[in-house]
Amino acid sequence: MTKEDIKKVLIKNKSLLKRYKVNKIGIFGSCVTGKMKKKSDVDLLVDFDEMIDLFDYVHLSDELQQMLKTKVDLSTPDAIKPYIKPKILREVEWIEGL
């Protein structure tokens, strides 16, 4: 699955993202750097309109994995380790059209 394929799937399922109060979602990691392999996971950075509980966070992650048919590593800006945060925030490609 290419970066563009991932973007299309996310845009197509924007109602699901809104249900989980997703303000914006972006792709980072190997999908963006062009180093994605067949067994690579999809790294997604999500910013919520308001805080959601752990149950909903895990459920969202599961639904994203089902949608994308691959393992998803879901993260929030606040959860990123300080030493790697600047790199990820420079690299992330936020999905337009949500």
Which residue stretches match the model-derived regions?
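Catalytic core of pol beta-like nucleotidyltransferases
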Residues: 1-24, 32-38, 50-98
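Conserved histidines in hydrophobic membrane contexts and catalytic metal-binding motifs
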Residues: 27
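Acidic Asp/Glu-based divalent-cation binding sites
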Residues: 41-43
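Short hydrophobic/aromatic beta-strand micro-patches
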Residues: 45-47
